[in-house]
Structures are given as C-alpha cells and as structure tokens.
Amino acid sequence: MPLQAPSIGEKFPEIEVMTTHGKIKLPDHFRGKWFVLFSHPADFTPVCTTEFVAFAKRYEDFKKLNTELIGLSVDSTFSHIKWAEWIKEKLGVEIPFPIIADPTGEVAKKLGLLHAQSSTATVRAVFVVDDKGVVRAILYYPQEVGRNIDEILRLIESLQISDKYGRAIPANWPNNELIGDNLIVPPAATVQEAEERLKKFKCFDWWFCYEDKATAEEKELARKFLKRVANC
C-alpha cells in the first residue's frame, strides 16, 4: 500500500478531485461534517449498482448523522454521469451525492485503493472521516460482496456516541448479548480508580464496567440500523 495511504487516527490527505458535482477539495469541502468516501471497482457493474442504489436510499439517514457521501472509481466523469442517469431512468433512483472521476488512478493510489493485481480497478473500500478531517474507520470488501449500508450507518452513530460520552461501544450495540444498550466504561488507570469503579458502575469485574448513558433516541436510531442489517 502506498506510504500516503491514511490510517485510522490520521488526517485525511488534502487532495483536489474532479467529481460529478464539479471540483472538490478534500477534506475541506466537508468541513464541520463527517463524510464517507467509498470506492467501487467500476461503473455499469451489477454489485456496484446495487450499492449505489442502497447508498442513495439511505442518504437522508446519513444526513441525520451530519454525514455526507462521496463515491470514487477509476472511471471518467462522463461514465459516472451516464451511469447515474441509467440508474435514475431504469431503476427510478436518483444519485444525490458526488462521484470522484479518477481515470489516471492518481487519487486511488494516494488512498491505497488500487488492486494489487491491477492498476485499472479500484478496491471496494470505505473511509469514514469525522468533522475534524480525521480518518475514524476503514473498511475493505471483496469484489464479489456488496457493502451493508446500514452497518456503516450504525458504525458512524457508534463513533459519534463514543465521542460524545467518552465510552466504548460493545458488539451488536444497542442489542449486545451481555450488556444490552449500555456503554462500556474505559479501563481504570490506577488501583484506587479500579476499586472505586466497582461501587460507581455495574461491573463484571474491575476491568469490565458499563453504564446506561445514551439517550432513548440514540438507542432507537441504532436499533433501526441494526434491525435493517439483520433483515438484509
């Protein structure tokens, strides 16, 4: 993977890109908002088409989380536009977000998104970038498997809740098998803190404590995403 490829916790690189909505400077274009940059192997392919329809249908859910979307592949702007037109005409779904045109592959190279065996195919990847321009999550999928958009939504909400409350998010939250919709308290830093937390929080042991912190609205939104994940 190229040295420039960002890692989790690093700033998203400053790049200017051409999109179906014109020139955009990343990450500044989305300053104050979260954004999801997702790459796809190619326009006019079945799996990618299903993904774009799914992203478009969930677009308002992303906006409720102060999150924007932007696609990317090593296709031209013309190809992106014609593909989006085909999706609207044939499938009745309008693509409301920009798609980066990268026919030379330069943007994909900077982000480490080209297949190792090919210089003309983008991997199926997702970058989740927060409102400060920091990469918070990176997901990779095989070519033959499309992404689950509702899980990406649940991931973003979980990261935002973790930031808000300073707590960690358990597996399958808010329907975790051990602690339900509670949040995990960070590990104790001292012996005294470890002893005190046993009195202050619900705990399985000093290193595994949890509390009910998120609001009812936050839990309900996450349950909606999780339910749709389960039903897919």
Curated annotation (Swiss-Prot):
GO biological process, one term: cellular response to stress
Pfam families registered for this protein in UniProt: 1-cysPrx_C, AhpC-TSA
Cellular component aspect of the GO annotation: cytosol
UniProt enzyme class: oxidoreductase
Residues annotated as catalytic: C48
EC number per UniProt: 1.11.1.24
Binding-site residues, substrate: R124
SUPFAM superfamilies according to UniProt: Thioredoxin-like
Keywords: Antioxidant, Cytoplasm, Disulfide bond, Oxidoreductase, Peroxidase, Redox-active center
InterPro entries: AhpC/TSA, Peroxiredoxin, Peroxiredoxin_AhpC-typ, Peroxiredoxin_C, Peroxiredoxin_TDXH, PRX_1cys, Thioredoxin-like_sf, Thioredoxin_domain
Tagged with keyword Nucleotide-binding: no
Keyword hit for ATP-binding: no
Location in the cell: Cytoplasm
CDD domains: PRX_1cys
GO molecular function: thioredoxin peroxidase activity
Catalysed conversion reaction: a hydroperoxide + [thioredoxin]-dithiol = an alcohol + [thioredoxin]-disulfide + H2O
Disulphide-bonded residues: C203-C209
Domain Thioredoxin: from-to ranges: 6-161
NCBIfam families xrefs: PRK13189.1
Stated role: Thiol-specific peroxidase that catalyzes the reduction of hydrogen peroxide and organic hydroperoxides to water and alcohols, respectively. Plays a role in cell protection against oxidative stress by detoxifying peroxides.
Misc note: The active site is a conserved redox-active cysteine residue, the peroxidatic cysteine (C(P)), which makes the nucleophilic attack on the peroxide substrate. The peroxide oxidizes the C(P)-SH to cysteine sulfenic acid (C(P)-SOH), which then reacts with another cysteine residue, the resolving cysteine (C(R)), to form a disulfide bridge. The disulfide is subsequently reduced by an appropriate electron donor to complete the catalytic cycle.
Quaternary structure annotation from Swiss-Prot or TrEMBL: Homodecamer. Pentamer of dimers that assemble into a ring structure.
Family listed: Belongs to the peroxiredoxin family. Prx6 subfamily.
Protein's name in the database: Peroxiredoxin
Native source organism of the sequence: Hyperthermus butylicus (strain DSM 5456 / JCM 9403 / PLM1-5)
